[in-house]
UniProtKB/Swiss-Prot annotation:
It is found in: Cytoplasm. Keywords: Cytoplasm, Methyltransferase, rRNA processing, S-adenosyl-L-methionine, Transferase. The lineage of its organism: Bacteria, Pseudomonadati, Pseudomonadota, Gammaproteobacteria, Enterobacterales. GO terms for molecular function: rRNA (pseudouridine-N3-)-methyltransferase activity. This is Ribosomal RNA large subunit methyltransferase H. The keyword Nucleus does not apply. HAMAP family: 23SrRNA_methyltr_H. It comes from Escherichia fergusonii (strain ATCC 35469 / DSM 13698 / CCUG 18766 / IAM 14443 / JCM 21226 / LMG 7866 / NBRC 102419 / NCTC 12128 / CDC 0568-73). Its EC number is 2.1.1.177. It comes from the Bacteria. Specifically methylates the pseudouridine at position 1915 (m3Psi1915) in 23S rRNA. Transmembrane segments: none annotated. GO terms for cellular component: cytoplasm. S-adenosyl-L-methionine binds at L72, G103, L122, S123, A124, L125, T126, L127. It catalyses: pseudouridine(1915) in 23S rRNA + S-adenosyl-L-methionine = N(3)-methylpseudouridine(1915) in 23S rRNA + S-adenosyl-L-homocysteine + H(+).
């Protein structure tokens, strides 16, 4: 199974690149984790936000292909670390690759939300999307460490 993070935005601060890459390199070869960046639509005073969301959503869904789609969204289901580890195990048993979608400043398109098999809420707080990349990578790595009895996670 391959994990794929599909995120809107291409120019991240150095600390995001550093943090995300740190966890990316830790994933084992039998569970590769990749980042697919979707260029953010141009937003301005007279921007058609609905159309921008639609276009970003189309690109995200195209990147995900036939993968299981999990959206990152405030109204999603909050998983604690053991629950995320259990989800990771279920995803592995399912056999399909998994695409986790992070929207842009206005969130995810209705099409992305409709295509999602699951929706995961990291927090009831609104989090900056660059930070979410790092949180998701660390959380998934920690979940993997639980499923393999790796010493990274301690009870």
């Amino acid at each position: 199974m391959k994990l794929q993070l599909v995120a809107v935005g291409t120019k991240m601060p150095a600390w995001v690149e550093t943090g995300f890459t740190e966890y990316l390199r830790r994933f084992p070869k039998d569970m590769p984790f990749e980042l697919v960046e979707i260029p953010a639509g141009k937003r301005g005073k007279n921007a058609d936000i609905k159309r921008i969301l639609e276009k970003e959503g189309e690109q995200m869904l195209a990147a995900a292909g036939k993968n299981r789609i999990v959206t990152l969204d405030i109204p999603g289901k909050p998983w604690d670390t053991p629950q995320l580890a259990a989800e990771l195990e279920r995803w592995k048993l399912d056999g399909r690759d998994v695409s986790l979608l992070i929207g842009g400043p206005e969130g995810l398109s209705p099409a992305c939300k409709a295509a999602a098999e699951q929706s995961w809420s990291l927090s009831a707080l609104t989090l900056p999307h660059p930070l979410v990349r790092v949180l998701v990578a660390e959380s998934l790595y920690r979940a993997w460490s639980i499923t393999t009895n790796h010493p990274y996670h301690r009870e």
